[in-house]
Amino acid sequence: MIAATQLPVNGFLSTGAPFVADVNLIVQLAMGGALVAGVILARKKRYRAHGACQTTVLLLNLWMIGFEMWPSFGLQIAPHLPRVFHTAYYTIAAVHAALGTAAELLGIYIVLVAATKTKLLPPSLRFTQWKRWMRIELALWLLSLMCGIGTYYEWYVAPFR
């Protein structure tokens, strides 16, 4: 594994963003595409492939949250809450964090419910309306992705225009 001190400081998208922010943006966009591919798999009733696709995205995103997004939020946003909602720099990032947290937690819950064949959750905590919950999850994820793109823009593109 590459140590963080060995990563380039400057990004590769020519926006003024650090390298890890550029990598995160590209990975998030790819995961958004993978989520849409997962929806297509579900519509084709290829549920095993759908589950593998969506779970992989969920776990990769959990890693990206821990590696890039949570530390950035903790350093740049959390110390200034709640008194900074008058600027897009903070507001978009805070909304992104809230939507992203909701999407990630719901995704983990969906995976746990899907795994109830092994009795991870008692019947009272399971749901049966899969389409509803999957659509809510997809909507949360896509809204979070859009806010994440907005955060990237506000942090790394807009200041240099």
Feature roles, as predicted:
Residues 1-161:
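Alpha-helical membrane insertion/targeting regions
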